[in-house]
Amino acid sequence: MYAVEDRHHPVPPPLSMDRISAPSVQYPSGTTSLRQSDHLAPVSNYQDGRSWSLQVVQQPIRARMCGFGDKVGDFSAVILLPLPNTSQDRRPITPPPCIRLIVRDAQTDKEIDIKCVQPATLIPLSFLTVSSSSEIDTSFYVLTVDLWNADGTSEVNLVKHSATSPSISTAMSSSYPPPPQSVSPTYPGYNQNQYPVGYPPQMNNYYGGQQVAYQNQYGQPVTYPQYYSGGQMPASMSPAAQPVTGGPGGMFTRNLIGSLSASAFRLTDPDNKIGVWFILQDLSVRTEGTFRLKMSFVDVGTSTETSNGAPVIEPHQSWPRFSLNPSRSSPPKSSPVLLRAPSSASALRYRVSRSPFARTE
């Protein structure tokens, strides 16, 4: 038997700094210098023996904040694709971001040409001329965009909007009240005239607001619902409407609005080089400030699967930066990138800032 003083207590090893992991620089914290912008560099992923990367050829520079109101304005920005019929003042980001997808061979680091390896053929019963085959299938290429702060450290896709200034956006983001419950035939608290056995019931006006009771074979009165003039029920009997509130400090709504995804198009740049392009012509920001766009490219048609059967979608990111001015200040316009279709036999044509443009399906 040892005394308490005679017991041997092992001395814990000294705490080594090697056991403490260094802070990650992928997303800098408050103590990390913002000059470490490694997380803002474009990401190139390797898949199926190819290198995929994004090149923002036309950077978004500035725009006017569109706010939370429902003001009607004009679409004077660069429009590439047909927009839905709407009267909302989008005030899109200018110039619209134009992103080029660069696909390289992982072994030779040579850019893969997407020109057709066979001549174009005419589809029967159609007036469109399309490519019969190509080295790259762009049918399932999708580009998505998110709004981040100027340092690229946190998302700002949502913004809190004050409930004192209603708009269509806040009305759409509110929840609907629950459906009214079925009305019971009897209403407790209201006088329902019942008569004993042997006395005929009192017959009043059809719209008089008084119930009619009949006797069944068991001696219990059977009541029927009342009918009120105008088809309306008393306020105390109607189901209470649930008020829609935006919380103590307002409600959250989207800060980046518009078309947040784009499909791929085969276009020719001013150097007469065919490439895979993504055009984001309908992007608007509600609030004022300096932001970045996080652009991610995915191939939704990939057949690679993980062990649990979920499809693998590799993101390819780019971080263009732009600033938003107040709604009354008009930013100067800049000359857009001139893009055209690789074939003149296209049936669909649009205009990009007074410049002819054709689109191929």
UniProtKB/Swiss-Prot annotation:
It comes from the Eukaryota. Its main location: nucleus. One of its GO terms (cellular component) is cytoplasm. Keywords: Cytoplasm, Nucleus, Sporulation, Transcription, Transcription regulation. Residues 1-36, 308-340 are annotated as: Disordered. Residues 47-353 form the Velvet domain. Residues 23-35 have a biased composition (Polar residues). Disruption phenotype: Shows reduced conidiospore formation but does not affect penicillin production. One of its GO terms (biological process) is sporulation resulting in formation of a cellular spore. InterPro entries: Velvet (IPR021740), Velvet_dom (IPR037525), Velvet_dom_sf (IPR038491). Residues 323-336 have a biased composition (Low complexity). Gene3D superfamilies: Velvet domain (2.60.40.3960). It is found in: Nucleus; Cytoplasm. Belongs to the velvet family. VelB subfamily. Component of the velvet transcription factor complex that controls sexual/asexual developmental ratio in response to light, promoting sexual development in the darkness while stimulating asexual sporulation under illumination. The velvet complex acts as a global regulator for secondary metabolite gene expression. Component of the velB-VosA heterodimeric complex that plays a dual role in activating genes associated with spore maturation and repressing certain development-associated genes. Component of the heterotrimeric velvet complex composed of laeA, veA and velB; VeA acting as a bridging protein between laeA and velB. Interacts with velA. Forms a heterodimeric complex with vosA; the formation of the velB-vosA complex is light-dependent. Interacts with vosA. This is Velvet complex subunit B. It comes from Penicillium rubens (strain ATCC 28089 / DSM 1075 / NRRL 1951 / Wisconsin 54-1255).
